[in-house]
From Swiss-Prot:
A Gene Ontology term for the protein's cellular component: cytosol
An individual GO BP term: regulation of DNA-templated transcription
InterPro entries: Integrase-like_N (IPR017856), TACO1_YebC-like_2nd/3rd_dom (IPR048300), TACO1_YebC_N (IPR049083), Transcrip_reg_TACO1-like (IPR002876), Transcrip_reg_TACO1-like_dom3 (IPR026564), YebC-like (IPR029072)
MF terms (GO), sorted A to Z: DNA binding
UniProt family annotation: Belongs to the TACO1 family.
Superkingdom classification of source: Bacteria
Keywords per UniProt: Cytoplasm, DNA-binding, Transcription, Transcription regulation
Name of the protein in question: Probable transcriptional regulatory protein lhv_0777
Length: 242
């Protein structure tokens, strides 16, 4: 993984999004609904649903909200959302990959286009930046929650089928093949680890530093994309901040 670390930036963005918690719950409800509708309402038999529920819990989403989304899918609701991706460049030439879940493609396309153009970015064609990212399973163990040292964690990760381990002062970050993600996650939980985060994500193969004079624009672009009700995830190839 060439030293790319996500955890510090993830924590920063989660803290910044506390004020937007209601919108986050709305987006998670949409994901839960679609996962339950396509794969069934039982998380034990639906790995995708289980993963989204875990994600919802890590964002402190109330249990009642989770149950309502599942019951809505069980009740035969006719709501349908399309999965769409958008690609482009942020100020400074930083690649951006956006995942959306929408019931109105025109509205979403307009929102994304405006976010890029108003904040110094440029929306690209399909495939323009996707090849710069790899789909990976991503798991985090907060070091304060385990007595295991790096050697022990590495051994357990390899035994579980993980691909890579990165260690920082705060966390163990584990990367997996997407197809092995659920098995690795379950094995680590069985080994007694408490997971701070576990999700499928997009990891840039290479990163680009954001120029100092473009940083504010870059942050505004990401915020504008995340503010869209239809945008589920925003991935960038920005270099990690020190």
């Amino acid at each position: 993984m060439s030293g790319h670390s996500k955890w510090h930036n993830i924590q920063g963005r989660k803290n910044a999004q506390d004020a937007k918690r209601g919108k986050i719950f709305q987006k998670l409800s949409r994901e839960i609904y679609m996962a339950a509708k396509s794969g069934g309402p039982d998380p034990d038999g639906n790995p995708t649903l289980r993963m989204v529920i875990d994600k919802a819990r890590s964002n402190n989403m109330p249990k009642d909200n989770i149950k309502r989304a599942i019951k809505k899918a069980e009740g035969g609701s006719e709501e349908h959302y399309d999965e769409i991706t958008y690609e482009g460049y942020a100020p400074g030439g930083v690649a951006v990959f956006v995942e959306a879940l929408t019931d109105n493609k025109n509205r979403t396309a307009s929102d994304v286009r405006v976010a890029f153009t108003r904040n110094g970015g440029s929306l690209g064609a399909t495939g323009s930046v996707a090849y710069m990212f790899d789909r990976k399973g991503y798991i985090v163990i907060d070091r304060s929650t385990t007595d295991a040292d790096e050697d022990q964690v590495l051994l357990d990760v390899m035994d579980a089928g993980g691909d890579d381990l990165q260690t920082s002062d705060d966390a163990f970050e584990i990367y997996t093949d997407p197809k092995q993600f659920a098995d690795v996650r379950d094995a680590l939980i069985k080994d007694g680890y408490k997971l701070a985060d576990a999700e499928l994500t997009m990891i840039p193969q290479n990163t680009t530093p954001v120029p100092a004079d473009k940083k504010e624009q870059f942050e505004h672009l990401v915020d504008a994309l995340e503010d869209s009700d239809d945008v589920q995830n925003v991935y960038t190839a920005a270099a990690d901040e020190d």
